[in-house]
């Protein structure tokens, strides 16, 4: 049986999921976001607890400005103004509120 080799980014996404999984009712990974026929991108991790959504963007290196821009754009199009946004740097294992 052939094993699938995960990318560094995918390993970091799974690492973050394992860190936060006990705090949420459900977690979705690599969620594509589309508007009409146009792709707006992908959210690395969406976590739900009750009626509250938290969005997580994972980067291999510390590129917080790019992550914030992506999260803000997704929140705008999904009308999730009250959702909390987080950035996770896999290299430094740092989780930051953005």
What are these model-predicted stretches?
Residues 1-98:
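Intrinsically disordered, low-complexity Ser/Thr/Pro/Gly-rich regulatory segments
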């Amino acid at each position: 049986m052939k094993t699938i080799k995960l990318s560094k980014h995918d390993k970091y996404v799974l690492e973050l999921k394992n860190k936060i999984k006990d705090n949420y009712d459900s977690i979705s990974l690599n969620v594509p976001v589309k508007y009409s026929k146009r792709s707006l991108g992908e959210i690395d991790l969406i976590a739900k607890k009750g009626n509250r959504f938290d969005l997580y963007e994972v980067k291999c290196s510390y590129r917080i400005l790019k992550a914030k821009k992506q999260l803000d754009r997704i929140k705008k199009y999904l009308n999730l103004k009250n959702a909390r946004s987080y950035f996770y740097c896999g290299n430094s294992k740092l989780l930051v509120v953005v």
